[in-house]
């Protein structure tokens, strides 16, 4: 709520995997502002564990936490953006989209699905001036992470949350009007994929 006040925005508490909460978020925002020009989707970390020891329920929970909110929110926001003549959506996922990690198996599996969905969505709705991109952060200082993970970056440090935020703001803005369907890594060189 404090951040919402600072940004002249709104705060709405809910869970991305709860369709009633996402419906209410969009309704609440439209009632307050009358339009939605951009949407940033960032969900928490799904269950982790050894690959074959993760329960079926945890795999389902990961799907509900990571992929389904993107699909649900897209269905809700697209008609609004169509009526407004366009908009921009950014999905925050992870660097492990390009290089899956056994440290984050469910995240690796379902977040690559978000990148695939993003490409399909941009193919379908790009002609209507609705853009969708993914931001793929590396290890960021807002998380409680072991220091040795910072050494994976060529900069030998964690990303600052402000560095991720500036990239997201760019992708949401008209400054990136010709960028859509992309999965953009902001990982400090952690991934080796070209």
Regions found by a protein language model. Name each.
Residues 153-164, 175:
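A conserved structural motif in NAD(P)-dependent oxidoreductases
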Residues 90-113, 118-127, 139:
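Catalytic loop of short-chain dehydrogenase/reductase
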């Amino acid at each position: 709520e404090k951040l919402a006040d600072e940004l002249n925005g709104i705060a709405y508490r809910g869970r991305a995997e709860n369709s009633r909460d996402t419906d209410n978020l969009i309704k609440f925002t439209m009632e307050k502002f009358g339009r939605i020009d951009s949407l940033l989707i960032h969900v928490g970390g799904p269950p982790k564990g050894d690959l074959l020891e993760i329960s079926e329920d945890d795999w389902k929970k990961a799907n509900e936490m990571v992929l389904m909110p993107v699909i649900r929110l897209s269905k809700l926001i697209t008609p609004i953006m169509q009526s407004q003549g366009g908009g921009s959506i950014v999905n925050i996922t992870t660097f492990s989209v390009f290089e899956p990690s056994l440290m984050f198996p469910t995240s690796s599996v379902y977040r690559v699905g978000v990148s695939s969905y993003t490409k399909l969505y941009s193919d379908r709705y790009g002609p209507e001036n609705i853009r969708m991109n993914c931001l793929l952060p590396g290890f960021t200082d807002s998380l409680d992470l072991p220091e040795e993970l910072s050494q994976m970056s060529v900069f030998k440090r964690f990303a600052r949350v402000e560095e991720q935020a500036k990239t997201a703001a760019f992708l949401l803005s008209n400054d990136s009007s010709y960028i859509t369907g992309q999965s953009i890594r902001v990982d400090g060189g952690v991934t080796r994929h070209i």
